[in-house]
């Protein structure tokens, strides 16, 4: 992934703004999707139920990993695009005699994809994950940057992991592609009425797949073919309903659907006036 060059003045301004600092809903990612329009991969902004804020993700791989992490009960906080201290990474590069990322004589601040906090007694209290497509692992420059990042977190005694598309099922990626086109803020005043409607049928007919249920509803209510499936997709994409992202959407049944974070949904309900 390639970002535009960031001047030292801009780096300092972003840090002074509190980017890369905070926790849960107060955390501000060091980089966000508005900062850079030159990304070669699809970026997205998605609401996190654990953090109660919008997350900035720069690829389908990051999105798939985030959705998986956000479902893990033991995880308390997920912070994306977290900056590494520049002086420390420059020193590590000098010690290892490897190049540090630099553009127009300006050292660039490295970032880790996710900093994760969890409360499981069987796991470390926090760990870091770098999400990267495996095709980039053939590039010497990328390998050098990954080693800088790994050494940085090693010095802090924080586990660091590399995550590629080979570590996630193609099914999860297919689900992301199915949902992504509808992953936009929905101001439909009937959203909660739709939720109640479909939740009722998920409970009534738990054995039907979403596609089977949608066909039934389209026929029963004389709706246009595919209309109910589109509405269900919208509710899933916007996370009003949740399901296991590793299970193919064609096999998802009503019993597999969960309602999104209740507190967040109540806030939306109050705002919408329903």
What are the residue ranges of the model-derived segments?
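Electrostatic, structured charged patches in enzyme active sites and in nucleic-acid/phosphate-binding
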Residues: 1-274
């Amino acid at each position: 992934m390639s970002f535009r060059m960031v001047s030292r003045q801009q780096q300092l301004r972003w840090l002074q703004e509190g980017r890369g600092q905070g926790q849960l809903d107060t955390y501000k990612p060091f980089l966000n999707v508005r900062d850079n329009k030159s990304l070669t991969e699809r970026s997205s902004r998605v609401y996190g139920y654990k953090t109660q804020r919008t997350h900035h993700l720069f690829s389908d791989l990051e999105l798939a990993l985030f959705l998986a992490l956000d479902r893990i009960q033991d995880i308390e906080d997920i912070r994306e695009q977290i900056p590494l201290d520049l002086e420390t990474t420059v020193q590590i590069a000098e010690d290892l005699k490897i190049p540090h990322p630099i553009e127009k004589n300006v050292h660039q601040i490295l970032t880790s994809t996710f900093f994760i906090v969890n409360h499981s007694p069987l796991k470390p209290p926090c760990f870091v994950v770098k999400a990267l497509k495996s095709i980039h692992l053939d590039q010497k420059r990328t390998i050098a940057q990954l080693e800088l990042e790994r050494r940085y977190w090693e010095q802090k005694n924080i586990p660091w992991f590399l995550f590629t598309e080979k570590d996630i099922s193609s099914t999860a990626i297919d689900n992301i592609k199915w949902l992504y086109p509808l992953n936009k803020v929905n101001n439909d005043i009937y959203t909660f009425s739709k939720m109640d409607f479909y939740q009722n049928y998920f409970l009534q007919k738990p054995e039907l797949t979403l596609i089977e249920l949608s066909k039934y509803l389209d026929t029963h209510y004389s709706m246009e073919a595919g209309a109910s499936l589109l509405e269900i997709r919208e509710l899933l994409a916007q996370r009003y309903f949740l399901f296991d992202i590793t299970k193919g959407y064609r096999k998802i049944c009503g019993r597999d659907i969960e309602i999104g974070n209740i507190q967040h949904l109540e806030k939306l309900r109050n705002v919408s006036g329903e």
